[in-house]
């Protein structure tokens, strides 16, 4: 395919036009009085959202240079979303301000590499200042306030704080669509996985269609169990102990399954067979998690263990096991707390080293099942469009709350960024580097100005007033009052604020140092073929 090349100012201005097109669509959503954006979908109902990254992903521009500019800003929003879960609109607004100021200075003759170094040093200084000034999140109310700011809804904030209080900071909070109106919170105690009983005959509570085992032995097998002679020696020992048995294996089938079912129906011996969750290596890892949680061992040929020689000492135990047709819950496994803590540390290290979002998510789920618990927030709404929008807001708010617990909170509403500007005076930079630091100083006020503008206030006046207020005091755009924002519950996680600034500065530096852009040449659409009949073909007179 033929390429088109633009140089110097033409190249940078083309990229900037693309950036502005995207940023102008995204920044209207910033702040408590920000508006929504409607996204057309090829199939189904349109999506209504105020999430920066969702809007950015939908924007495709026609001009090749503008398209590249927009793609670069999408990267800012996506990276901020990946790292912090929120702050995508703030990152986009900061990127736009940094690029606008930077290009103005490049056009005036400043050296782009000098500006880049100045921007990087300034951003590092502001980041360190933000981390130092961050307040630790200690109370449920602080978590609720932070999540409520992200979701724009106090009830959602309170529900997320309640969920985090119950499952701990390591716990998993998932959001599901509900058929009923409003919000509900469901909590799971113990380890739950998405596999139920293999046969309905194992049910002990016919009304609830559940199999409940009190104080059972738990047999974990990495292979299929199909012949009864493999199981018999172990079954006899379990029957002598007078305890029920939960078998979790790749599969339980044939005569092994029918023997368990017959003994259950006759009342001789209570047991339940369940397929192990996951596939391949993930299944092995989850079985090992269960073994550590219940104080048992996985019967596997890899470690030289077989069912025929298995002893009761290899079995895990728990206070209670509840099995439905779809899921199994192990409550209060009898595993050693030090072994569980070691396994948790190992999974946490795997999360740190993983490059794949999917793997990270699955590891996080495993971590939660071992260390915390699982909370499900069920969201309902009047229409499907509203439901999708609400679910998205809750997911963002959950990640926001977790980020707040991780690194602490700073004053929200763009105030923390604006009031970080004085740290730039101590850098002692000169020449183009000092100009680069000044570009950052100007950009730091952009989020607050946009929030003020969206709230119908004069941006310049608000920024001037807030810069002269004590640290942490600023505009509460929801009420229009100037007050102590942390006390008023207007807070942002410092992880979100610093990620937005770092990612915006990274892309802005690339913009400024660009000297040529190579893009695909738009193909001209072929002219439609002429009709040999002169347009009269096929007509019946």
UniProtKB/Swiss-Prot annotation:
Its EC number is 5.6.1.7. GO terms for biological process: protein refolding. Keywords: ATP-binding, Cell wall, Chaperone, Isomerase, Nucleotide-binding, Secreted. It comes from Mycolicibacterium gilvum (strain PYR-GCK). It is found in: Secreted, Capsule; Cell surface; Secreted, Cell wall. PANTHER family: 60 KDA HEAT SHOCK PROTEIN, MITOCHONDRIAL (PTHR45633). It catalyses: ATP + H2O + a folded polypeptide = ADP + phosphate + an unfolded polypeptide. This is Chaperonin GroEL 2. PROSITE patterns: CHAPERONINS_CPN60 (PS00296). The keyword Secreted applies. GO terms for cellular component: capsule; cell surface; cytoplasm; extracellular region. Belongs to the chaperonin (HSP60) family. Disulfide bonds: none annotated. One of its GO terms (molecular function) is isomerase activity. Forms a cylinder of 14 subunits composed of two heptameric rings stacked back-to-back. Interacts with the co-chaperonin GroES. Its main location: secreted. The lineage of its organism: Bacteria, Bacillati, Actinomycetota, Actinomycetes, Mycobacteriales.
